Amino acid sequence: MIWVWGGAAVAVVVILVAVLFTLSGSPAKKTSSDGLVTTFLPGEFQTVPTVCNSVTSATLGQYLPGKLHMVAPHSLDGSAQSLCNWTLDTPPLYRVLEVTAQAYAPSGLATGDGSATFAATDAYQQALQAKRHPAKGTHLPAAAVTSLPGLGTTAFAALQVIVTRPDATDLETVVARDHNVVVTVVFQGPHDHTARYGPVSPALLQAGAAAAARNVLSQLH
């Protein structure tokens, strides 16, 4: 995706590593003959909340203060997935917040017993690996990764500085897992002063991304 400010195009390729599993509404046995889990277990979620409604106005007002443009991309997985993007473009402020929530289903391709939680754990680990060691074709730098205790079952934050001369963008990604749900938040803004915009601190980006993720996780039921 490409964000433009000050006459310069900043190409930011955001890889949200998420393997979409089709949810079945038909009854299923708890385990298959080979011991794999084939249905949702207690505490797992079959749907996710609507992200656009879950991120609170308080969070948006604190981290994206100003008039926002909101877009709700179409889900490719029904009620098991929800996406929402907000853009703040009021010089000297420029920020983009992207939030995705995905509920994973049991899968024979998952590790462990194939449960929905194992499927989500696999996706979480793949996302972490992609930040530490980005695929060569993405042209993204390796991220500075930190853990975020107390956010979901497990969570991490990853900061990447995307340089497209003469400008640079700070890209903060927070990925949090709660049972079989993975919430991915990408929050970005200018790294340095530009002709129209001022920089945004990495600390603010991480705090905003974590707050958005916490908002979504709090609505799981």
Where are the language model's segments positioned?
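Intrinsically disordered, low-complexity Pro/Gly-rich regions
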Residues: 1-9, 18-20
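Generic detector of intrinsically disordered, low-complexity, polar/charged segments
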Residues: 3-4, 22, 32, 149
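N-terminal leader/presequence regions that precede the main folded/catalytic core
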Residues: 11-13
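Hydrophobic single-pass membrane-insertion segments
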Residues: 18-30
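A small/polar (G/S/T-enriched), proline-flanked helix-loop surface module common
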Residues: 27-221
